[in-house]
């Protein structure tokens, strides 16, 4: 009952999925030219808003997600709270290990530390969350302008989370909801993805949102 309509984007020609009777409406979008992550979700949002009865909430979902219990009921409760910009679940691996989906602000120094000495503990400050599973109030996603489509892949989730917080919205962690996400880490393995990642980081670090967020970001209190 939590899901009203699902939009499936076919970013390149592929066989259609086997028809199944779902308890919600399923609609497909077919791109003539492959688009980036943010552009695809913005397109789905525009189509949803054009429906006769558009949903009050909009979920961004990766195709490699799974779950054993419906995560949407607790996510909807969290996203309906005052000042909620988006709600997100706990992400775990197929072996039930907690993913590092909550991150601190990426800087050249922090990324170097991450690759030289990986630390998978929860960061002292959560500045952004990966966009594998996010639930937005539709009015918030619309007013914030959705994803910045200049980010073809990578960092569009960082940019969106920073812009949400600059507008006074909160990133709502929802411990009652859990999804399984097998992160591909393609930028660690494929040169093309690595170049996309580097280009997106360069764009992020030179963006107005990044500069504004760093200026207003207060130092963490040491315990």
Give the ranges of each region predicted by the language model.
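Conserved donor NDP-sugar-binding/catalytic core segment of glycosyltransferases
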Residues: 65-100
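Active-site-adjacent helix/loop segment of glycosyltransferases
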Residues: 159-223
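Short beta-strand-to-loop acidic/aromatic patch adjacent to the donor-nucleotide binding site
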Residues: 54-66
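Short, flexible, basic/aromatic active-site loop/helix in glycosyltransferases
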Residues: 105-127, 131
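Acidic donor-binding segment of Leloir-type glycosyltransferases
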Residues: 1-33, 51
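Acidic donor-diphosphate engagement hotspot in glycosyltransferases and nucleotidyltransferases
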Residues: 40-41, 69-74, 157
């Amino acid at each position: 009952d939590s899901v009203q309509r699902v939009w499936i984007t076919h970013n390149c020609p592929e066989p259609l999925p086997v028809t199944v009777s779902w308890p919600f409406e399923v609609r497909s979008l077919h791109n003539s030219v492959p688009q980036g992550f943010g552009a695809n979700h913005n397109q789905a949002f525009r189509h949803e808003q054009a429906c006769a009865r558009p949903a009050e909430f909009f979920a961004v979902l990766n195709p490699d997600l799974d779950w054993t219990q419906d995560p949407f009921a607790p996510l909807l409760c969290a996203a309906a709270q005052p000042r909620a910009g988006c709600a997100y679940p706990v992400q775990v691996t197929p072996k039930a290990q907690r993913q590092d989906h909550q991150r601190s602000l990426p800087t050249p120094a922090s990324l170097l530390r991450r690759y030289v000495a990986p630390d998978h503990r929860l960061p002292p400050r959560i500045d952004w969350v990966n966009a594998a599973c996010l639930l937005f109030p539709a009015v918030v996603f619309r007013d914030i302008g959705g994803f910045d489509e200049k980010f073809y892949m990578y960092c569009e989730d960082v940019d969106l989370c920073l812009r949400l917080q600059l507008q006074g919205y909160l990133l709502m962690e929802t411990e009652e909801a859990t999804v399984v996400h097998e992160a591909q880490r393609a930028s660690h393995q494929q040169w093309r993805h690595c170049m996309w990642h580097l280009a997106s980081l360069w764009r992020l670090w030179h963006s107005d949102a990044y500069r504004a967020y760093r200026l207003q970001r207060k130092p963490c209190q040491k315990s």
